[in-house]
A protein has these predicted regions:
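Short, well-ordered beta-strand elements within core beta-sheets of diverse protein domains
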Residues: 10-18
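Solvent-exposed alpha-helix faces
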Residues: 28-29, 72
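Disulfide-stabilized extracellular beta-strand modules
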Residues: 47-57
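Short amphipathic alpha-helices within nucleic acid-binding modules
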Residues: 19-28
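Short beta-strand
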Residues: 4, 42-45
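C-terminal structural segments of small proteins and small subunits
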Residues: 55-83
Length: 83
């Protein structure tokens, strides 16, 4: 996991892209992996940024292996050759 912050029982990261379109394209690609893992983040889009927050609600809002696995997968998703 690259540049994820662990605070308040959550893993957090902001992904930064060159444009709004790249940010949205990344979210679309990420949604495929999110559905595959059936582990859904809280996330927001702010122009060229996507803020992602991971925690496992059914384990008492704590960080679990599910969160770490999704974080690692999200780190590998590229848009136009960039992360």
């Amino acid at each position: 996991m690259y540049n994820w912050n662990e605070t308040n029982n959550e893993l957090k990261k902001t992904f930064v892209f060159a444009t709004f379109k790249e940010a949205i394209d990344w979210m679309v690609k990420a949604s495929v992996e999110i559905e595959k893992q059936n582990h859904h983040p809280t996330w927001t889009n702010e122009y060229n940024k996507v803020h992602v927050c991971l925690t496992t609600h059914d384990e008492g809002n704590t960080i679990t292996q599910k969160d770490r696995e999704l974080a690692q997968a999200l780190d590998t998703i590229e848009v136009n050759g960039a992360f």
